[in-house]
Design a protein with these regions (language model features):
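Catalytic core and acceptor-binding pocket of nucleotide-sugar-dependent glycosyltransferases
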Residues: 129-205
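Short acidic (Asp/Glu) patches
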Residues: 57-65, 91-92, 141-150
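Short aromatic/hydrophobic "clamp" motif used to bind/position activated sugar donors
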Residues: 76
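A short acidic, amphipathic alpha-helical/loop segment
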Residues: 18-20, 66, 89-95
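N-terminal anchoring/stem segment of glycosyltransferases
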Residues: 1-60, 69-73, 188-191, 203-205
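Conserved donor-nucleotide/metal-binding helix-loop-beta segment in metal-dependent transferases, i.e.
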Residues: 85-125
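Residues that flank catalytic or metal-binding motifs in active/ligand-binding sites
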Residues: 2, 25, 63, 79, ...
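The conserved acidic donor/metal-binding loop of glycosyltransferases
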Residues: 80-84
Length: 205
């Protein structure tokens, strides 16, 4: 029997868990969290220990590595903690995972904020930090990482994913390799995951 899961992560009280508007047959809903008081009627709350002094990385290891934490499932859909399911997720699986083991949404299709470049994404992060006095990550770390990619010849305007929703056959070998590489970049460099994955995908083509 094929097992399917929608999952999310909430660490450090960053998001308020949103109940799904639609609960399809054959799907489980799991939330990984460090919050012992988090409750839900629809989500299975999985309280887990933290591994880092960084709530973002604590959350992203579950986001990026479902093969480690959800190996009993064949298909997974990750959604950000502030998002909800409104329609049948089987349609997403049928539309996007028939010929691929992983699928993301294209940031350049975002009508309000289209972007297609990791270097532009880094600039937006810098501008946001300057404007608000609160950087989403160490700007010097991001600058160093982007310089490394430039030195390796990674081109501008080569695409950008949005990481709010990820569809995966996460136990497939190529998906596991990609996710482990993605996690290595996040673990040792910037935690801004959108800066990394499209570059890794480019290297595998």
């Amino acid at each position: 029997m094929i097992k399917k899961v929608v999952y999310t992560t909430i660490f450090g009280g960053y998001d308020d868990l949103v109940e799904p508007h639609y609960i399809p047959d054959g799907w489980d809903f799991i939330c990984f969290t460090d919050d012992s008081n988090l409750k839900s009627d629809a989500w299975k709350i999985v309280k887990t220990k933290t591994f880092y002094n960084d709530n973002t990385r604590n959350a992203k290891q579950f986001k990026v590595l479902p093969h480690r934490h959800l190996s009993d499932y064949d298909y997974s859909i990750f959604i950000d903690g502030n998002m909800t399911i409104r329609n049948n997720p089987d349609e997403l699986i049928d539309n996007y995972l028939n010929s691929s083991n992983i699928a993301f949404f294209n940031h350049n299709k975002n009508l309000l904020d289209p972007r297609d470049c990791i270097y532009k994404e880094a600039e937006v992060i810098f501008e946001f930090g300057k404007r608000n006095g609160n950087y989403k990550d160490n700007p010097e770390l991001i600058k160093s990482q982007m310089q490394t990619y430039q030195d390796e010849g990674y081109p501008k305007n080569n695409g950008l994913i949005t990481g709010m929703v990820i569809l995966r056959k996460h136990n497939e070998k190529d998906c596991i390799v990609m996710m482990e590489d993605w996690w290595t970049e996040i673990k040792y460099h910037s935690r801004r995951d959108q800066l990394v994955l499209i570059m890794l995908l480019g290297k595998t083509k």
